[in-house]
């Protein structure tokens, strides 16, 4: 399990940075935190909770787009959210009436139809991420929280940097140890012990994403006003 956790650690960090503006992870009895300095006014609640069919979802998204454009000169063109939030879109009165004009909002709304409408109306391409992972405590967590809607520009938002672990630098030359690099930057070290006789296994990784575009991202908590 430890190796699986290490293999997804960099992905967890990237999604934390994108959806919260910071990283907070636990490991080896320590808490690792890093704040990317995202402007506080680029993290906001909504005018009315989006679960309310009368919420002004389109206006909220336009407000966020205008804010990022005004502050940075960059247009946000992508968004990531959950199926829960897409369900709010599906029930939203304004969105339904805008799509089903001839039937006064009556009709079935698929995710594909909603995505196309938002793309045509606001030039925002929506991605749904409902993927989950098991954290260090064994609890199942989401990469993207249920009630989060994150807007960001096209292109590369940053990159992940990998460092050399102590096992790679110090133990690879020792006959008593066997170090293998798996996935990206994950060092799996096995060492034979004589007293008592056993094999000790360590799984280590050193990595940190950078996020130079943090000020070009807008995060909505859609369940709070």
Give the predicted meaning of each segment.
Residues 3, 76, 198:
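Extracellular structured ligand-interaction cores
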Residues 8, 31-35, 125:
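Ser/Thr- (and often Asn-) enriched beta-sheet segments in non-cytosolic proteins
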Residues 10, 14, 69, 73-76, ...:
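Residue-level signal for secondary-structure boundary elements
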Residues 11-28:
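Short, glycine/acidic-rich hinge or "gate" loops at secondary-structure transitions
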Residues 96, 101-225:
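Sequence/fold signature of self-assembling virion shell proteins
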Residues 8-9, 208:
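Generic hydrophobic alpha-helical segments
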Residues 31-113, 117:
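Extended, solvent-exposed, turn-rich assembly/linker loops in the middle of proteins
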Residues 1-8:
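Short, small-residue-biased leader/transition segments that mark boundaries at the very start
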């Amino acid at each position: 399990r430890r190796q699986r956790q290490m293999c997804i650690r960099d992905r967890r960090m990237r999604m934390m940075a994108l959806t919260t503006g910071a990283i907070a992870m636990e490991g080896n009895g320590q808490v690792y935190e890093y704040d990317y300095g995202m402007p506080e006014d680029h993290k906001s609640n909504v005018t009315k909770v989006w679960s309310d069919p009368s919420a002004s979802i389109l206006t909220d998204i336009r407000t966020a787009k205008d804010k990022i454009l005004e502050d940075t000169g960059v247009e946000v063109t992508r968004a990531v959210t959950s199926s829960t939030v897409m369900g709010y879109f599906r029930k939203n009165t304004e969105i339904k009436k805008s799509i089903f004009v001839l039937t006064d909002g009556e009709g079935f709304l698929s995710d594909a139809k909603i995505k196309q409408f938002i793309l045509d109306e606001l030039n925002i391409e929506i991605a749904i991420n409902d993927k989950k992972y098991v954290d260090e405590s064994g609890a199942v967590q989401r990469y993207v929280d249920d009630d989060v809607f994150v807007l960001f520009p096209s292109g590369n938002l940053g990159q992940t940097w990998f460092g050399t672990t102590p096992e790679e630098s110090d133990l690879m030359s020792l006959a008593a140890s066997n170090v293998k690099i798996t996935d990206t930057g994950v060092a799996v070290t096995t060492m034979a012990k004589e007293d008592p006789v056993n094999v000790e296994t360590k799984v280590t990784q050193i990595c940190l994403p950078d996020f130079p575009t943090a000020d070009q991202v807008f995060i909505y908590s859609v369940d709070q006003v």
